[in-house]
Structure formats: structure tokens, C-alpha cells
């Protein structure tokens, strides 16, 4: 691999990381917007930090940091930054695999906790504005009512509940949505993992090539 190949690899790695950095900025900005507007509220009162805004801010920040290291490491041909980029990608990949395994192993327990969390939050619909906004959004988007049905609303279903006797509860409707989109979720997850592995491979290759070039130039 000559100098021309080194430059090509360097700019390819920089370009893709720059795109990811821009995506991270957009995700972070949207997350901050949701936090400021408090649009979707809190659905699980026992996990108040688990809101769409918080999740997007965390994900966007991580993407920006990792992509920044990749950009600077590639364009500056800095081995320390490249290895930091590689290690962070590896840790993220391991975390994703660990999370997938835990979700599979504890699927029933997680389902139980989700149902309990939903049943608890529905009791605070009229007393907590964030909880009310979250439930109104979920019910209007999924066209569902309550956790298991409209009977969950003791004082009567709110206006966000769709009318009709055969309306499903949001718990089953959410499960149905997840299962119907499982293939697409799996494809996106695999694509993300492949991109991460490619990024790690490019970083290692560029790092090794920098060593070879330095040795050839007697540096």
C-alpha cells in the first residue's frame, strides 16, 4: 500500500466519520429540542430519565465524540486518536451485543417490568402533566387505549383513546408493533454493527500503514 492508498484510506475514513458527526449533531439537537419542549413526557415514572429526549441526547453525544476522534485521527494521521476511536467502537459494539443477550435472556422479566411500569404511570395520568402527555402521544400514535384496554381508565378513557369496542391495549399493541417490525429492526442493527466493524478495520489498517510509512521514511 503506497502513499496514494494511504491518502485514499485517510480521506474515506474522514468523510464517513464527518457524516456520522453531522448525524450526531442532528440527533443531539433534536433531543435537546424535545427536552426543552417536553413534548413526549415521562411514560415510566420509575425511570424518569428514560425519555425520548434524554436517549437522543446521549446517543447523539456518543456519536459526535466517536466520529470526532475518527475525523481528527484520520486527517492528522494521529495513532493515539485512531486507537481511541478503535477502542470506543469496540466498547460500543460489545455493549450492543451484551444488551442484545440480556434482552433475549430476560425477555419475560422485562415484559413484566414494562407492564408494571405502564400500570403505575396510568394512575398518575390526571395528576402529572408529563405522564399525561406521554400517554396521549402513545395512544394517539398506536391507536390503543390503556395498558390492557379502556377498562384501565377508572374515571373513563381520555380523548386520546380511539373510539370503538375492539380497541386494543397499548401493551399488546406495542408488542405487536415490535414483532411486525422485528425484521427491519434486525436489518438496521446488523448494518450498524457492520459499519462499526468496518470503521474499526479502517482505523487499524490506517494505523498500521502510518507505522510502515514512518519506517520507510526513517522517522
Swiss-Prot record:
Keyword annotations from UniProtKB, A to Z: Cell junction, Cell membrane, Glycoprotein, Membrane, Transmembrane, Transmembrane helix
Gene: Cd53
Protein family according to the UniProt entry: Belongs to the tetraspanin (TM4SF) family.
Stored InterPro entries: Tetraspanin/Peripherin (IPR018499), Tetraspanin_animals (IPR000301), Tetraspanin_CS (IPR018503), Tetraspanin_EC2_sf (IPR008952)
One GO term of the biological process aspect: positive regulation of myoblast fusion
Role of this protein: Required for efficient formation of myofibers in regenerating muscle at the level of cell fusion. May be involved in growth regulation in hematopoietic cells.
UniProt subunit comment: Interacts with SCIMP. Interacts with CD45/PTPRC. Interacts with IL7R. Interacts with RBL2 and PPP2CA.
Protein name as catalogued: Leukocyte surface antigen CD53
Amino acid at each position: 500500500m503506497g502513499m496514494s492508498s494511504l491518502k485514499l484510506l485517510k480521506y474515506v475514513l474522514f468523510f464517513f466519520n464527518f457524516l456520522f458527526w453531522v448525524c450526531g449533531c442532528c440527533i443531539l439537537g433534536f433531543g435537546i429540542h424535545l427536552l426543552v419542549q417536553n413534548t413526549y413526557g415521562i411514560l415510566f415514572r420509575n425511570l424518569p430519565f428514560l425519555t425520548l429526549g434524554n436517549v437522543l441526547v446521549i446517543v447523539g453525544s456518543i456519536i459526535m465524540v466517536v466520529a470526532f476522534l475518527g475525523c481528527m485521527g484520520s486527517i492528522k494521521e494521529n495513532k493515539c486518536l485512531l486507537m481511541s476511536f478503535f477502542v470506543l467502537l469496540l466498547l460500543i459494539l460489545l455493549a450492543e451485543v451484551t444488551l442484545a443477550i440480556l434482552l433475549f435472556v430476560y425477555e419475560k422479566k422485562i415484559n413484566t417490568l414494562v407492564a408494571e411500569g405502564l400500570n403505575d404511570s396510568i394512575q398518575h395520568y390526571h395528576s402529572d402533566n408529563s405522564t399525561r402527555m406521554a400517554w396521549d402521544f402513545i395512544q394517539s400514535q398506536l391507536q390503543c387505549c390503556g395498558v390492557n384496554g379502556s377498562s384501565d381508565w377508572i374515571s373513563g378513557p381520555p380523548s386520546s383513546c380511539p373510539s370503538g369496542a375492539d380497541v386494543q391495549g397499548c401493551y399488546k399493541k406495542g408488542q405487536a408493533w415490535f414483532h411486525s417490525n422485528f425484521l427491519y429492526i434486525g436489518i438496521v442493527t446488523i448494518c450498524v454493527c457492520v459499519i462499526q466493524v468496518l470503521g474499526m478495520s479502517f482505523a487499524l489498517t490506517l494505523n498500521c500503514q502510518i507505522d510502515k510509512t514512518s519506517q520507510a521514511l526513517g522517522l
